[in-house]
């Protein structure tokens, strides 16, 4: 998660499916009910978590940094947003425990995951050539899908899982059958995505790894990762069914196609606040429609510069019925 306006606690809007202003009050209330996370906590003998000290609207309690391994040499996953309190915690933790960092792995480019890199390099200059990220920036090292990073007691395998961002990587801790899920699966709530179809495919790829535990970049540890991923996929598939059902209702009323605004009204009703409709629901349903279009299940035509969506499945059903009627008439003649 990151912010286009430079607020390290925010989230960079990519498809505007979530809007900080529209959901400010809601998110504040949601955050107030989140469980407390200690600043530093040994989660397992191999995984130490340091909280990013960047709690915010879209970072939940803050971005989790994970220090992985059992010996002196260890690996860091994600670097928070570069808050002074975070780097002080990192420095104190490494010193007190006699830890040396050999690799820094970044799940993706968002500033609340990469912002601490300059401070790490300033304090530990040897890390300059050991910052790893998919689609790397200058002076960073590339990560390949399936690449292995190993230290004493920990073998980490990289897994390309785009959707939240194109460069998004997850990391599998082989010894624990656990996965660092980045922002794809959160400890609480649901992540925003760049591309819904790609995101759903990545969730399935993640599920196929059969990892038991999820270490999310935001929120608490996920004790049953397969159930969490399955629930997320089920929810997204339910949204697809809602959209297709709405288009079917329009067709039943004699309307072949419908605009995005009308589809949102069909699904959620008339009693919608305009900001909620315009800044959240319409962009989200538009993303679902684009995903369904990519699957060949819906299409649109432009009328007066406005996209009007229709179900290709309904079109095929109507065409098939018309063909049957024509065939029956031909036989009768």
UniProtKB/Swiss-Prot annotation:
Atrochrysone carboxyl ACP thioesterase; part of the gene cluster that mediates the biosynthesis of an emodin derivative that may be involved in black Sigatoka disease of banana. The pathway begins with the synthesis of atrochrysone thioester by the polyketide synthase PKS8-1. The atrochrysone carboxyl ACP thioesterase MYCFIDRAFT_190111 then breaks the thioester bond and releases the atrochrysone carboxylic acid from PKS8-1. Binds 2 Zn(2+) ions per subunit. Belongs to the metallo-beta-lactamase superfamily. It comes from the Eukaryota. Pfam families: Lactamase_B. Keywords: Hydrolase, Metal-binding, Zinc. Its EC number is 3.1.2.-. Zn(2+) 2 binds at residues 112-113. Pathway: Secondary metabolite biosynthesis. Zn(2+) 1 binds at residues 108, 110. Its cofactor is Zn(2+). This is Atrochrysone carboxyl ACP thioesterase MYCFIDRAFT_190111. It catalyses: atrochrysone carboxyl-[ACP] + H2O = atrochrysone carboxylate + holo-[ACP] + H(+).
């Amino acid at each position: 998660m990151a912010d286009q306006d430079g607020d390290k606690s925010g989230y960079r809007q990519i498809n505007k499916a979530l809007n900080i202003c529209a959901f400010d009050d809601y998110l504040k209330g949601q955050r107030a009910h989140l469980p407390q996370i200690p600043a530093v906590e040994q989660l397992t003998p191999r995984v130490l978590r340091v909280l990013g000290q960047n709690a915010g609207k879209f970072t939940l309690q803050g971005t989790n940094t994970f220090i992985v391994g059992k010996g002196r040499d260890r690996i860091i996953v994600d670097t928070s947003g570069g808050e002074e309190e975070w780097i002080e915690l990192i420095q104190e933790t490494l010193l007190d425990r006699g830890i040396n960092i050999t690799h820094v792995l970044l799940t993706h480019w968002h500033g609340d995951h990469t912002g601490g890199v300059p401070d790490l390099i300033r304090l530990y200059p040897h890390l300059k050539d050991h910052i790893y990220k998919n689609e790397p920036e200058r002076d960073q090292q590339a990560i390949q899908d399936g690449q292995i990073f190993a230290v004493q007691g920990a073998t980490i395998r990289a897994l390309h899982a785009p959707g939240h961002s194109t460069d998004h990587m997850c990391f599998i801790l082989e010894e624990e059958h656990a996965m660092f899920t980045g922002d794809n699966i959160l400890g609480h709530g649901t992540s925003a995505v760049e591309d819904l179809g790609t995101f759903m495919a990545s969730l399935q790829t993640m599920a196929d790894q059969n990892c038991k535990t999820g270490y999310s970049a935001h929120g608490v540890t996920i004790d049953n990762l397969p159930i969490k991923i399955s629930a997320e996929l089920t929810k997204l598939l339910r949204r697809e069914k809602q959209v297709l059902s709405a288009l079917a209702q329009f067709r039943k009323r004699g309307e072949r196609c419908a605009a995005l605004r009308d589809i949102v009204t069909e699904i959620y009703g008339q009693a919608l606040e305009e900001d909620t409709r315009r800044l959240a629901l319409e962009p989200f349903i538009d993303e679902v429609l684009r995903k369904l279009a990519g699957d060949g299940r819906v299409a649109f035509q432009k009328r007066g510069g406005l996209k009007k969506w229709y179900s290709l499945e309904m079109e095929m059903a109507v065409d098939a019925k018309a063909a049957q009627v024509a065939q029956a008439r031909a036989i009768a003649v």
